Amino acid sequence: MENNELLDITLRPKSLKEFIGQKKIKDNIEVFIKAALIRQEPLDHVLFCGPPGLGKTTLATVIANELGVNIKSTSGPVLERAGDVAAILTNLSDRDILFIDEIHRLPRMVEEILYPAMEDFTLDIIVGQGPSARSIKINLPRFTLIGATTRTGLITSPLRDRFGVVFRLEFYNSEELKEIVKRSARILGILIEENAATEIARRSRGTPRVANRLLKRIRDFAQVKDKDIIDLQIAQEALIAMDVDDYGLDDMDRKILLTIIEKFNGGPAGIESIAASLREDKDTIEDVYEPYLMQEGFIERTARGRVATRFAYEVLKRKIPERLF
């Protein structure tokens, strides 16, 4: 496992008490967990939706810790055949958790295997071929499926309807991110000034994963410059060096906005056209960059495509077209 991955795991909260932000979701999860423990039943199936880096995987692990059960983690693209799911499900114990990241990318055949597993805790397996083929029903342990997706609209209705609990994670505010930065700094053994933590939080795109990534890189700058503490000056210098501006926009964010403004006259522009112009994957733009740009009012999605807002023109110091006056 890479050092960065080990660091990321170290920084992840292990309990609901340690988890910062998403208060309403946390409060509901706490109730559902307590009820499941009182009844000695598995937690109902849970679906987490929202942009990358907001804590979907972390919350799945936290739930397992709070319930005192094992968690088996996998992802939609990895589960190519029905047998892949069957092998995992039959090796779970009662009340264990199966976590499927990118659940919207499950092949249809695999998804259909999950229907009876989620509803009745059974698997219907076809044995043999041709006229001699027969169906065998296998009883499964009473497990909890936790799914995570950045693309709720791509999940089929039959699968979505089988989740008893659906949560949409929202971007974090600056105060929550500042607390996350300070907590991560303590774990990493870094001294950081209050205003430096505020600055990092302000430029973290509302996303804990980004906040932690920026903190680790700013630590590099501080150590190379022989600084014992991250102060506001070193934080700002490092953020400028990494092309992260006052609004949290990075180089790719600006390229997306400038493409809409300069190549498509401010839009509307189709996502495929934008992706082709940037030579970037369409899904990456939609999943990673677009949610924040929309949240902060840089672009709007219309039936005809993406449109750059007046705010985008102002921030990028481009001449504002008459239609936006």
Swiss-Prot record:
Residues noted as binding DNA in the record, renumbered to the chain: R301, R306
Keyword vocabulary terms for this entry: ATP-binding, Cytoplasm, DNA damage, DNA recombination, DNA repair, DNA-binding, Hydrolase, Nucleotide-binding
Cell compartments where the protein resides: Cytoplasm
Catalysed reaction equations from the record: ATP + H2O = ADP + phosphate + H(+)
Alphabetical list of Pfam families matching this protein: AAA_lid_4 (PF17864), RuvB_C (PF05491), RuvB_N (PF05496)
Principal location listed in the UniProt entry: cytoplasm
UniProt: ATP binding residues: L11, R12, G53, K56, T57, T58, E119, D120, F121, R162, Y172, R209
Catalytic EC class: hydrolase
Region annotated Small ATPAse domain (RuvB-S), chain positions: 173-243
Residue ranges, annotated region (Head domain (RuvB-H)): 246-325
One term under GO cellular component: cytoplasm
Function, in words: The RuvA-RuvB-RuvC complex processes Holliday junction (HJ) DNA during genetic recombination and DNA repair, while the RuvA-RuvB complex plays an important role in the rescue of blocked DNA replication forks via replication fork reversal (RFR). RuvA specifically binds to HJ cruciform DNA, conferring on it an open structure. The RuvB hexamer acts as an ATP-dependent pump, pulling dsDNA into and through the RuvAB complex. RuvB forms 2 homohexamers on either side of HJ DNA bound by 1 or 2 RuvA tetramers; 4 subunits per hexamer contact DNA at a time.
Family: Belongs to the RuvB family.
UniProt-recorded name of the protein: Holliday junction branch migration complex subunit RuvB
